From Swiss-Prot:
Ranges of biased composition (kind: Pro residues): 343-352
Official protein name in the record: Hematopoietic SH2 domain-containing protein
Post-translational modification: May be phosphorylated by FES and ACK1.
GO molecular function, one term: protein-macromolecule adaptor activity
Gene Ontology BP annotations: negative regulation of B cell apoptotic process; negative regulation of mitochondrial depolarization; signal transduction; T cell activation
Biased composition (Polar residues): 180-191
UniProt-listed SUPFAM superfamilies: SH2 domain
Ranges of Basic and acidic residues composition bias in the record: 283-295
UniProt KW keywords: Cytoplasm, Nucleus, Phosphoprotein, SH2 domain
Annotated PANTHER family: HEMATOPOIETIC SH2 DOMAIN-CONTAINING PROTEIN, T CELL-SPECIFIC ADAPTER PROTEIN TSAD
Location, primary (coarse class): cytoplasm
Length: 352
């Protein structure tokens, strides 16, 4: 008898029909004595050789869907096909009677002879070794197929020993714990992400504030540059007035004039009049001169170098006074000075 834990070799595909359709029906009331599994024709003849006449056995056929009835005749062993019909009945080809089971077929031919030899079935041929039956492989294979159909996933796992599975599970635990620790550390180190809608709102607000911030920065830069330019230009002009050649000339030409000191210090007055050219203002402590006197003073004291300096001051002041709300208006030409600050023609009165 084969070992209980060892599976038999797989049956040929032509025997699958027996395992799936006939095994339960055949073993319902116990396996009959005349059934010998899927033995070959030669093995069947060897078993019947020592048996009396009329001894028979039934085996699973290897050539068709059905069985083979083998019995011992007077001269030799005879073999008849037993076909399994579509409705589940059994019939020997050439006969007209179909039987519901193999037991019914055996009982029928124990009473009526098999054509054409007209011989009856007398007694079944039993197993040669009852401890090692020849149909055991079929039943083992049928049980294995039934278990695999019931639980196809757990069948391979049961074949491996349990200690190995326990050892593998113990080895896998540290790696799983390490993975959990690393995932926790990664989640703790990463800052919480803000929702997408909140991020969009922040971005939109910053984009809205860009033009206003740019305008404020531009105004601050303009005011800073204007103050720096004015302060530097005023310092340069004061140094040139104190130590320049224009001062000596004015003092020599007007040394006898009591107002020569005032005229030598008329540049700050001119600078203040540039801030509001339309309304020139004179110092309070001196008399207001006539138009001709102003022209003569401007002609005497204003030189080409002074004119360029005045132009730079006017440009700086105009850029400082320009504001965003006046951007649409046309700017006045910075190069055009009032008539009082321009050089008079060569033959104008008061020209010297």
């Amino acid at each position: 008898m084969t070992e209980a834990g060892k599976l038999p070799l797989p049956l040929p595909p032509r025997l699958d029909w027996f395992v799936h359709t006939q095994m339960g029906q055949l073993a319902q009331d116990g396996v009959p004595e005349w059934f010998h599994g899927a033995i070959s024709r030669e093995d069947a003849e060897n078993l019947l050789e020592s048996q009396p006449l009329g001894s028979f056995l039934i085996r699973v056929s290897h050539s068709h869907v059905g069985y083979t009835l083998s019995y011992k005749a007077q001269s030799s062993c005879c073999h008849f096909m037993v076909k399994l019909l579509d409705d589940g009945t059994f019939m020997i080809p050439g006969e007209k009677v179909a039987h519901t089971s193999l037991d019914a077929l055996v009982t029928f031919h124990q009473q009526k002879p098999i054509e054409p030899r007209r011989e009856l079935l007398t007694q079944p041929c039993r197993q040669k070794d009852p401890a090692n039956v020849d149909y055991e492989d079929l039943f083992l294979y049928s049980n294995a197929v039934a278990e695999e159909a019931a639980c196809p996933v757990s069948a391979p796992e049961e074949a491996s020993p349990k200690p190995v599975l326990c050892h593998q599970s113990k080895e896998r635990k540290p790696s799983a714990e390490m993975n959990r620790i690393t995932t926790k550390e990664a989640t703790s180190s990463c800052p919480p992400k803000s929702p997408l809608g909140e991020t969009r709102q922040k971005l939109w607000r910053s984009l809205k504030m860009l033009p206003e911030r740019g305008q404020r920065v531009r105004q601050q830069l303009k005011s800073h540059l204007a103050t720096v330019n004015l302060s530097s230009l005023l310092d340069v002009r004061r140094s040139t007035v104190i130590s320049g050649p224009g001062t000596g000339k004015g003092s020599q030409d007007h040394s006898g004039d009591p107002t020569s000191g005032d005229r030598g210090y008329t540049d700050p007055c001119v600078a203040t009049s540039l801030k509001s050219p339309s309304q020139p203002q004179a110092p309070k402590d001196r008399k207001v001169p006539t138009r001709k006197a102003e022209r003569s003073v401007s002609c005497i004291e204003v030189t080409p170098g002074d004119r360029s300096w005045h132009q730079m001051v006017v440009r700086a002041l105009s850029s400082q006074e320009s504001k965003p709300e006046h951007q649409g208006l046309a700017e006045p030409e910075n190069d055009q000075l009032p008539e009082e600050y321009q050089q008079p023609p060569p033959f104008a009165p008061g020209y010297c």
